[in-house]
Structures are given as structure tokens and as C-alpha cells.
Amino acid sequence: HPVENAGLTHARGAAEGFFLTVDMCPSSKPFEAGFFAALAARAARDGRAMPVAISISGYWALDHAAEFASLIERQRLGQLDITWVNHSYAHRYVRGVPDRENFLLLPHTDFEQEVLRTEQLLIARGLTPSVFFRFPGLVSNERLMATLRRLGLVPLGADAWLAKLQKPRPGSIVLVHGNGNEPFGIHEARHYLADATQRWLPLNEALAG
């Protein structure tokens, strides 16, 4: 049975802030450079690195090497406090196929390799993969979830996908796409970023019970 939005969608305990997650699915478009610059500007205003979880797909990283390098550089400069989330390697998607049969549920998908190849890519760049895995399309099933548990990873969902007009509340895991494919979500996120009273928290804190 397909499962949608399984896993961690909200902080397990009380959290006085939001958790920003930015998905980088494969895309032919330039990434949201202005948005990442706005995150860096927020960091400068706050006097601390802006916490953000970035979900990296292998194909995006390979096709957008300079953009990927710019994110790593923002981390090195102390502008962004990045939690590197695994978002699969190929992130296959077939237009016209229902979501419940699409993404990692497509035939001939080697799920374990989809996970491990992205981990290897991150490590090769000197990055530390986090314990989090975000399913493409937020679509999984019981078999994939069992494999993920065996690999020791935590499935990451979201309860505030901004492009779907889901409103965050304290403890929300906020989802936007930074790959240029969902500009409306980025537009919505800018409203929350402009609020100087809104706290943004590192994703690991969402696991605290």
C-alpha cells in the first residue's frame, strides 16, 4: 500500500519555532539564488547561521554543480547551518503516472542504491549526511519504509508545504522547493522570513521528545 507523507512531519515535542526544509529535486531550471541570499541576509541580521535542511537529489547535484558548490560555500562562510537530507539519487518521476505508483514506486527502482549513492555523493564533497531521508513526492510504501529503518534513517515529511497553502504553526516542518520548480512556495516563505520575531530551528531539534 502506498503511504503519503510518512515519518516526521512535526516536532515530536514542544518547539518554539519552525523547521525550514528546502527540496532540490532534479530540474532544468536555475535554483532560487535570491532565496538562498535572503537566508544569508537573515543570518546576518540575526548574528548566527540560518538553520535550513536541504534535501539533495543526486541528479540535481550533478546537473547544478556550481549552484551546489555555492550552498556548500554559504555553509563554510557561516551563513547557513545546513542539515543535509538525502532526497534519493535519480528521483525518477513519470508524468501522467499516479503518485501512488510513481517516484520510488516505479518498476526497476533499486531503493537501497537510491539512498546510498546520494550518501556517497555528499561524503565525496566533504559533507556529513544527516539521519533524514525525504521521499520524492513524499510517497513511499511499507517495504521502502522497512528498508529505510534497516539503513538507520528517519523519513522526513512536512505539515506545512507552503505551495499547497498549508500554514505553519509552532513545531511545523516547512517544505519549499529551491530548485526553481515551485516559485509560489518560495514567495510564501519570504513572508515568514521577513518576520524578525519568527524563530527558525535546526531540524535535529525536531527529534527531541
Language model features with spans:
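Active-site beta->alpha N-cap acidic-glycine motif
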Residues: 1-84, 129
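Active-site glycine-centered loops adjacent to acidic/histidine catalytic or metal-binding residues
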Residues: 23, 87, 136
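C-terminal active-site subregion of NodB/CE4 polysaccharide deacetylases
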Residues: 1-36, 123-125, 139-209
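CE4/NodB-like, metal-dependent polysaccharide N-deacetylase domain
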Residues: 43-55, 83, 103-139, 174
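Residue-level "edge-of-site" marker
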Residues: 58, 90, 135-136, 161, ...
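A general structural detector for well-ordered alpha-helical segments in enzyme core domains, enriched
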Residues: 35-39, 67-74, 114, 118-121, ...
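Substrate-binding cleft of extracellular glycoside hydrolase catalytic domains
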Residues: 57-119
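Solvent-exposed, acidic/flexible segments
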Residues: 28-33, 60-65, 104-115, 137-141, ...
